[in-house]
Amino acid sequence: MADAEHERIFKKFDTDGDGKISAAELEEALKKLGSVTPDDVTRMMAKIDTDGDGNISFQEFTEFASANPGLMKDVAKVF
């Protein structure tokens, strides 16, 4: 998946346009993919937010997307 596709999806998740994905934004995006629990969101944040600042940067998102191409293909179909 190309960086342009990662950027497109990232911007869909980053609903307030501040350049990072918060836990609340991640939860809203995951709800579009199906049912999601608060524990699911917490686990995803812990996995993707590698610097531990409580937000997902574009770099963190891209690294996760590159490591999980199958999942990102499914996400791209929805977004």
Curated annotation (Swiss-Prot):
Q: Which residues bind Ca(2+) 1 per the record?
A: 14, 16, 18, 20, 25
Binding-site residues for Ca(2+) 2, renumbered to this chain? 49, 51, 53, 55, 60
> What are the transmembrane regions?
none
Q: Does the keyword Zinc-finger apply?
A: no
Q: Which UniProt keywords apply?
A: Allergen, Calcium, Metal-binding, Repeat
Q: Which residues form the EF-hand domain?
A: 1-36, 39-71
Cite a single GO MF annotation: calcium ion binding
Pfam families documented for this protein: EF-hand_7
Among InterPro entries, the record links this protein to: EF-hand-dom_pair, EF_Hand_1_Ca_BS, EF_hand_dom, EF_hand_pair_protein_CML-like
Q: What is this protein called?
A: Polcalcin Bra r 1
